[in-house]
Amino acid sequence: MQIWPHKHIHSLANFSIKDYESVFELANRFDALKNSGTKKIPALQGTLVTSLFFEPSTRTKNSFELAAKRLSADVQTFAPSSSSLTKGETIIDTAITYSAMGADTLVIRHSSSYITFEIAEKLDAINSKTSVLNAGDGLHSHPSQGLLDIYTLIKFFSKNTLNPGVLNSKKILIIGDVNHSRVARSNLWALSAFGADIILCGPETLIPDEFTNFLKTPAPNQIEDPVKSRGCITISRSLEESIKIADAIIVLRLQKERMMENLLSSIDSYSLDYGLTSEKLSLNNKEIPILHPGPINRDIEISSKVVDQYPNCLINNQVSNGIPIRMALLYLLQKNNQ
């Protein structure tokens, strides 16, 4: 395995192919250990992972904490409502405080885009050894979700082996609220890195035309594009036509808590046009994989019948795969600091 080059993980925009492969190979090894009956290993014994979640979370928060515990790390959790934030302390000072307590990795979720960059810069300025791992920041990025989504697709298409080349030229359809989705942005970087052709489908209020240029926009602190050959992004307004040619589908929920104005005429009309149903899926002559990062709004962006009965609905696979992916990220960051 290559030497891990990152002290902090903010975004997949700065990931090279070797970075992806390092994460996937290590996650696969951790997954194999679990499947053999070994649920806990001493890889990070004596280290401290601190979970700083300023937004609600079920999957990501618990997945990171379980990942840390399976590596035998100590886990410190944070509750905003009972912290000094209520007394006026800043988020950055909170992070510095936990670093001073000995946190080796801060896993951070917050509503402000790019906040993890600010925190990491402050920590580095005081020569802290603490790593920062972005667990979702505003509209910007959700790298661990992007990684687990691509890992799930690779395992599906390569029949549970690990061949990232299987995504090359695959048509991956992403449906819904791309504009307000940090998951979608991470998926765009990761899918394109492996040569997938991406179709974004939804109304213009949720997928503006400029998303076709997304991959041409430099990421913060990105000196050069680490991946030279990418797939392409196209935009469709017809879900039915998009489903006909898709090799896989990623469904996004409506991020109503991030919408600053009413962008839809009604939820019912959105569901009618862009909700994924068994009837619409029947337009594709293959049983293609369906992903959703959760939480699900049943019978709005995806029908309960698809979630519960469609044979290649991989939502639970995503949740399961999130644990070894996050184990890999925590392990790589800590080994970088040793």
UniProtKB/Swiss-Prot annotation:
It is an enzyme of class 2 (transferase). One of its GO terms (cellular component) is cytosol. GO terms for biological process: 'de novo' pyrimidine nucleobase biosynthetic process; 'de novo' UMP biosynthetic process; amino acid metabolic process. L-aspartate binds at residues 87, 182, 253. Gene3D superfamilies: Aspartate/ornithine carbamoyltransferase. GO terms for molecular function: amino acid binding; aspartate carbamoyltransferase activity. The keyword Transferase applies. Keywords: Pyrimidine biosynthesis, Transferase. It catalyses: carbamoyl phosphate + L-aspartate = N-carbamoyl-L-aspartate + phosphate + H(+). Coiled coil: none annotated. It comes from the Bacteria. Signal peptide: none annotated. Carbamoyl phosphate binds at residues 59-60, 109, 142, 145, 294-295. Pathway: Pyrimidine metabolism; UMP biosynthesis via de novo pathway; (S)-dihydroorotate from bicarbonate: step 2/3. Its EC number is 2.1.3.2. Heterododecamer (2C3:3R2) of six catalytic PyrB chains organized as two trimers (C3), and six regulatory PyrI chains organized as three dimers (R2). Catalyzes the condensation of carbamoyl phosphate and aspartate to form carbamoyl aspartate and inorganic phosphate, the committed step in the de novo pyrimidine nucleotide biosynthesis pathway. HAMAP family: Asp_carb_tr. Belongs to the aspartate/ornithine carbamoyltransferase superfamily. ATCase family. NCBIfam families: asp_carb_tr, PRK00856.1. This is Aspartate carbamoyltransferase catalytic subunit.
